[in-house]
């Protein structure tokens, strides 16, 4: 996701530079345009280097490390949820629905 946002910002910068280059010749002063182009190049280099510093080197190499399953949710909470589900599945359906409250007809319930 971070890589996608950095690519979008890079494309926007390149698009703005390209759009500025299309300005009519009479609106651009040669000396001023050289200064602006130098400043723009420096700005673009700073932005690109900042974006590349934020990106991990493994992403640049094309290696995306898999996220371990345990990092998403601790084992205790998964076991606890499974135990609650097993207890509720042993009850009849009417008893399982008892703690839930219907707020509106045919919409959502809160358990």
Curated annotation (Swiss-Prot):
Signal peptide as annotated in the record: 1-19
Pfam families documented for this protein: Somatostatin (PF03002)
Keywords linked to the UniProt accession: Cleavage on pair of basic residues, Disulfide bond, Hormone, Secreted, Signal
UniProt superkingdom: Eukaryota
An example Gene Ontology molecular-function term: G protein-coupled receptor binding
Coiled-coil ranges from the UniProt annotation: none
GO cellular component, one term: extracellular space
Compartments reported by the entry: Secreted
GO aspect biological process, one term: regulation of cell migration
Propeptide residue span(s): 20-87
Stored InterPro entries: Somatostatin, Somatostatin/Cortistatin_C
Keyword Signal: yes
Keyword Cell cycle set for record: no
Cystine connections: 100-111
Main location per the UniProt record: secreted
Function: Somatostatin inhibits the release of somatotropin.
Name of this protein: Somatostatin-1B
Species of provenance: Carassius auratus (Goldfish)
